[in-house]
């Protein structure tokens, strides 16, 4: 197999992206850490561990050897955010284009993923693919639109024919950090919406939380230099609406279980898949405080993940002083 594009990460999202890329007949190499995933993809064209029920294209080949990624110019990186840097440092060479598809903030350093990738692969040009996407829908070929934030117009021109498909539409942005911030903050807000659902607080409360959470996303984005129009698009508001309203979201499902009384420690120990928001919440809360950004919903999620009673934390949120909806009206 001579592939022009490879996917690094054999979880649900990585497998779905490989399936989407392979839909036009091009060869796709899928790197997975788990030997059982590699074996099943190659022998049976399935990934029953992470994407059950999806029959994979025969032009997807799986490997567990990073050396097989050598000389492939474009790499979609779909490893868990907290392990991305370590995995990228094992690559035999820096690919021309790294497209980061994981959403999160590095816990130990507070860095966005593009900064982590730039250190690990200094010779690569970095792009961000982010938006309202459920893996099972992308794998099934259902219509999907995403933000593809690129480091240059030249990179966009290279990547769009490789990634765009009739049912998978990337939209160009030059705001790489903004595209990342939307996805990372959204994960934490999705946990909050799940908590509201788990507590049985109703649809009104969820809608209010989405709107006020979006305001927090905008404030944090502004503090880090993101463009407001980026966060109003697919990678911000679009992703927020999708994942704050469905149990198909791992972060929403985690929050729902927290609202129902389970602890974060127990839930994270039981999970096969990663709910990135649980790892992002503590570092996001710390960054917001350090930068003087008011993010009460994010702070509330962080307290609940740390073990605080969800009902009590929500009561504290509802007891906050009344204020103008927009800071410009204050």
Curated annotation (Swiss-Prot):
Catalyses which reaction(s): sn-glycerol 3-phosphate + NAD(+) = dihydroxyacetone phosphate + NADH + H(+); sn-glycerol 3-phosphate + NADP(+) = dihydroxyacetone phosphate + NADPH + H(+)
Disulfide pattern: none
InterPro entries in alphabetical order: 6-PGluconate_DH-like_C_sf (IPR008927), 6PGD_dom2 (IPR013328), G3P_DH_NAD-dep (IPR006168), G3P_DH_NAD-dep_C (IPR006109), G3P_DH_NAD-dep_N (IPR011128), NAD(P)-bd_dom_sf (IPR036291)
Location relative to the cell: Cytoplasm
Residue sites binding sn-glycerol 3-phosphate per the record: 103, 131, 133, 186, 239, 249-251
Gene Ontology biological-process annotations: carbohydrate metabolic process; glycerol-3-phosphate biosynthetic process; glycerol-3-phosphate catabolic process; glycerophospholipid metabolic process; phospholipid biosynthetic process
GO cellular component, one term: cytosol
Record: active site: 186 (proton acceptor)
Pathway(s) the chain acts in: Membrane lipid metabolism; glycerophospholipid metabolism
Binding site for NADPH: 13, 33, 103, 135, 250, 274, 276
GO MF terms, alphabetically ordered: glycerol-3-phosphate dehydrogenase [NAD(P)+] activity; NAD binding
PROSITE patterns: NAD_G3PDH
Function: Catalyzes the reduction of the glycolytic intermediate dihydroxyacetone phosphate (DHAP) to sn-glycerol 3-phosphate (G3P), the key precursor for phospholipid synthesis.
Family, as annotated: Belongs to the NAD-dependent glycerol-3-phosphate dehydrogenase family.
Stated name of the protein: Glycerol-3-phosphate dehydrogenase [NAD(P)+]
Species: Erythrobacter litoralis (strain HTCC2594)
């Amino acid at each position: 197999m001579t592939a022009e594009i490879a996917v690094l990460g054999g979880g649900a999202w990585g497998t779905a992206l490989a399936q989407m890329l392979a839909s036009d007949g091009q060869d796709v190499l899928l790197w997975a850490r788990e030997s059982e995933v590699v074996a099943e993809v190659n022998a049976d064209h399935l990934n029953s561990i992470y994407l059950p029920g999806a029959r994979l294209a025969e032009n997807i080949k799986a490997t567990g050897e990073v050396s097989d990624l050598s000389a492939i110019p474009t790499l979609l990186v779909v490893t868990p955010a907290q392990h991305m840097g370590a995995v990228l440092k094992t690559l035999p060479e820096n690919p021309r284009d790294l497209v980061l598809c994981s959403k999160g903030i590095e816990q130990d350093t507070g860095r966005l993923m593009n900064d982590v990738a730039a250190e690990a692969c200094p010779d690569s040009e970095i792009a961000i693919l982010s938006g309202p996407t459920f893996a099972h829908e992308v794998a099934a070929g259902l219509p999907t639109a995403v933000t593809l934030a690129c480091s240059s117009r030249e990179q966009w021109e290279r990547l769009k024919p490789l990634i765009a498909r009739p049912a998978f539409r990337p939209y160009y942005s030059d705001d790489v950090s903004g595209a990342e911030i939307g996805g990372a903050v959204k994960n934490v807000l999705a946990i909050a919406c799940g908590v509201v659902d788990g507590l049985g607080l109703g649809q009104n409360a969820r809608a209010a939380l989405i709107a006020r959470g979006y305001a927090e996303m905008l404030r944090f984005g502004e503090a880090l230099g993101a463009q407001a129009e980026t966060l109003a698009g697919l990678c911000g508001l679009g992703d927020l609406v999708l994942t704050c309203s469905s149990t198909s979201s791992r972060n929403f499902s985690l929050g729902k279980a927290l609202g129902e009384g389970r602890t974060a420690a127990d839930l994270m120990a039981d999970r096969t898949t990663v709910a990135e928001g649980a790892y992002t919440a503590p570092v996001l809360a710390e960054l917001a405080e350090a930068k003087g950004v008011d993010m009460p919903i994010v702070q509330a999620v962080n307290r609940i993940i740390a073990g605080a009673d969800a009902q009590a934390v929500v009561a504290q949120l509802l007891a906050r002083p009344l204020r103008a909806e927009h800071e410009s009206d204050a």
